């Protein structure tokens, strides 16, 4: 039976500041570093291991993975980095404070941008310096496939080819796999694994720094899945993700 661990990166500096991050390359906060180390201990306490790792091209996911590997004395484990595991691209929203954006555009509009399945955020132009076409880490990616703002639907379409081309073959070969990625790229994988529809995945929240363990049959269908650690903590962290972008009530 193959095992797959999905891990959202620890809290980032912009998670802490409640900003839309997307493809902006920010680092972990001190709390995020602690979450990554705690995730490693949860994996160790369950007696789990992994023989190959996958992550995105963004620092917060890469550093989360490295902290887990270091804590578990697994820095030698092969790692594959790929842009298809990057966070959803939030277009012109990247860098904006979520609550300030809600105050300006309304909570309902921000909810649609964040949680709807097929509505993209306002996009950025290809000549914008923040467009990924200008980032050297994507120099080998065809410019016409680099996003300028994505819906969750577009994120799913971007992520799933990597599942079929890289992650699934590792699992089919009998390797236990750790994927350290982002809230929306992981939502795409969970949607596929759990057979969620667009309404279900729109309500799905992935907490930072908590490993989600899947046990998969020979056809890579889930036999079981759960968050490691305290289920109440997983629910609390997921609620915190859902609350982002809401205005404070007086």
Curated annotation (Swiss-Prot):
| Entry annotation: catalytic residues | 9 (tele-phosphohistidine intermediate), 87 (proton donor/acceptor)
Write out the catalysed reaction.
(2R)-2-phosphoglycerate = (2R)-3-phosphoglycerate
The keyword Nucleotidyltransferase is annotated on this UniProt entry? no
Instruction: Cite the Pfam families for this sequence.
Output: His_Phos_1 (PF00300)
The UniProt keywords, alphabetically, are:
Gluconeogenesis, Glycolysis, Isomerase
Residues binding substrate are 8-15, 21-22, 60, 87-90, 98, 114-115, 183-184
Q: Describe the task this protein carries out.
A: Catalyzes the interconversion of 2-phosphoglycerate and 3-phosphoglycerate.
Residues folding into a coiled coil are none
UniProt site positions, description: Transition state stabilizer: 182
Q: Does the keyword Isomerase apply?
A: yes
Q: What gene name is listed for this protein?
A: gpmA
Quaternary structure (record): Homodimer.
Name of the protein in its database record: 2,3-bisphosphoglycerate-dependent phosphoglycerate mutase
Enzyme class, broadest EC rank: isomerase
GO MF term (any one): phosphoglycerate mutase activity
């Amino acid at each position: 039976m193959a095992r797959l661990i999905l891990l959202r990166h620890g809290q980032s500096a912009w998670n802490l500041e409640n900003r839309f991050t997307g493809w902006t390359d920010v680092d972990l906060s001190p709390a995020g570093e602690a979450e990554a180390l705690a995730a490693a201990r949860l994996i160790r306490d369950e007696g789990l291991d992994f023989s190959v790792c996958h992550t995105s091209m963004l620092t917060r996911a890469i550093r989360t993975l490295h902290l887990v590997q270091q804590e578990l004395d697994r820095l030698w484990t092969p790692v594959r980095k790929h842009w298809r595991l990057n966070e959803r691209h939030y277009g012109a929203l990247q860098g904006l404070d979520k609550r300030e954006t809600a105050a300006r555009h309304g909570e309902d509009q921000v909810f649609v941008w964040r949680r709807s399945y097929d509505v993209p955020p306002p996009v950025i132009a290809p000549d914008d310096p923040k467009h990924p076409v200008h980032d050297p880490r994507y120099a080998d990616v065809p410019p016409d496939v680099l996003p300028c703002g994505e819906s969750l639907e577009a994120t799913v379409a971007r992520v799933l080819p990597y599942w079929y081309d890289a992650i699934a073959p590792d699992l089919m070969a009998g390797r236990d796999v750790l994927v350290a990625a982002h809230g929306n790229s992981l939502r795409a994988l969970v949607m596929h694994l759990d057979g969620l529809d667009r309404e279900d995945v729109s309500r799905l929240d992935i907490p930072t720094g908590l490993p989600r363990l899947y046990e998969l049959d020979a056809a890579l269908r889930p036999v079981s899945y759960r968050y490691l650690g305290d289920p109440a903590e997983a629910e609390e962290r997921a609620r915190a993700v859902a609350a982002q972008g809401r205005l404070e009530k007086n």
